[in-house]
């Protein structure tokens, strides 16, 4: 099996780290604009399977030429703007593709992908990704669903949350700030509730949950849960559906005030040379929120479900992972990158056999995927408890 990994950033590094240990993988080519960085990183792995190449993904010809190199599958860890160009190039080259971004930009490519016999699997990271598999499994356990909540988080491990924000960066800081002003939708009492981006941290939209070993965490709406009610096939029966971000206590109150003061605004300030408040926050806070080499991040996924004809009292699925200090891989890297790499193998081996634009909800088999995660030290724990009531 020959695998192409696009991007050697935080997630691409984890994909390559995982792939080179697999005896069924003949070679891994990692392509990045910063090829020297990729070469240095690959050299540290000490694997003859891994090779670095330079690529400008914004150049359609260069992308097409690279994908024509005889690969079985490409794992795309590039920024969101490259999702469609990579998918189109993969279809043209007859190469399967996996990415970790939302699928909105490529849904219309289902027909061309099917015609080419190509599987394109988006949303295959952590959130979205593993959370969607957990949600699909929870839904399968009931005849009909009345309540479904999904929680996702990347926060410092207990003890390493020792700065004023109780937060550090294991993803892109710009992406985190953008998510803090992204409109959300939830289903509450059977009705779709629209939440403007400036109000996602308002008290009326949040609640708290207890997660071991973190204690009480705040939950704020994250993205479009109503959309996923449709995709899970529960829109006609569910009275409560939500997707939430978890943070340590105090986070919501602080960001609620900063948002109200305009610190996440995207309008340039002429007196400051056209810098936007959001850009200032990215550049000023980013360097101050990094992890030290001996500090750990943590990833949390929780899915809570309740319904008819399933486990009495409801069902909760939990995933908690921490940074591996030996490899240096953050929990965020591990869960996003390993999930994408596992799915890439499953497509080539026909464990995932669909073609076209696929979905983790519909097309990724639960037990083989969970088993593969467990081999990497990542477990999903089931407990017999459903969602608590939200006022």
Identify the function of each model-found stretch.
Residues 57-71:
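Conserved Rossmann-fold cofactor-binding substructure of NAD(P)-dependent oxidoreductases
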Residues 141-391:
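C-terminal catalytic/substrate-binding lobe primarily of soluble NAD(P)-dependent oxidoreductases
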Residues 100-122:
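Rossmann-fold NAD(P)-binding glycine/threonine-rich loop
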Residues 45-59:
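Rossmann-fold cofactor-recognition segment
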């Amino acid at each position: 099996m020959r695998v192409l990994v696009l991007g050697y950033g935080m997630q691409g590094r984890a994909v390559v780290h995982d792939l080179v240990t697999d005896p069924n993988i003949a070679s891994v080519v990692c392509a990045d604009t910063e090829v020297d960085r990729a070469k240095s990183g690959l050299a540290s792995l000490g694997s003859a399977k891994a090779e670095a190449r330079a690529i400008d993904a914004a150049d359609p010809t260069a992308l097409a030429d690279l994908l024509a190199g005889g690969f079985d599958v490409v794992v795309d860890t590039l920024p969101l703007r490259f999702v469609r160009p990579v998918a189109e190039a993969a279809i043209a080259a007859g190469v399967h593709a996996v990415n970790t971004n939302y699928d909105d930009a490529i849904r219309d490519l289902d027909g061309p992908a099917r015609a080419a016999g190509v599987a394109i699997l988006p949303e295959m990271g952590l959130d979205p990704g593993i959370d969607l598999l957990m949600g699909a499994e929870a839904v399968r356990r009931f005849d009909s669903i009345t309540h479904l909540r999904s929680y996702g988080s990347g926060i410092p491990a207990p003890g390493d949350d020792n700065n004023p924000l109780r937060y550090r960066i294991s993803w892109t800081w710009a992406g985190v700030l953008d998510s803090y002003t992204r409109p959300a939708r939830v289903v509450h009492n059977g009705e779709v509730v629209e939440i403007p981006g400036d109000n996602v941290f308002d008290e009326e939209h949040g609640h708290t949950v207890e997660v071991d070993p973190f204690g009480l965490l705040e939950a704020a709406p994250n993205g479009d849960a109503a959309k996923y009610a449709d995709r899970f096939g529960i829109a006609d029966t569910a009275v409560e559906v939500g997707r939430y971000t978890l943070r340590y206590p105090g986070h919501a109150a602080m960001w609620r005030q900063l948002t109200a003061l305009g610190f996440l605004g995207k309008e340039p300030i002429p007196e400051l040379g056209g810098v936007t408040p959001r850009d200032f926050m990215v550049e000023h806070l980013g360097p101050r929120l990094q992890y030290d080499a001996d500090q750990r991040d943590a990833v949390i996924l929780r899915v809570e479900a309740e319904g008819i004809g399933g486990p009495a009292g409801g069902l909760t699925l939990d995933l908690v992972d921490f940074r591996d200090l030996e490899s240096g891989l953050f929990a965020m890297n591990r869960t996003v990158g390993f999930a994408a790499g596992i799915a890439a193998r499953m497509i080539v081996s026909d464990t995932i056999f669909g073609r076209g634009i696929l979905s983790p909800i519909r097309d990724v088999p639960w037990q083989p995927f969970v088993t593969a995660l467990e081999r990497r030290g990542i477990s999903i724990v089931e407990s017999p408890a459903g969602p608590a009531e939200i006022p």
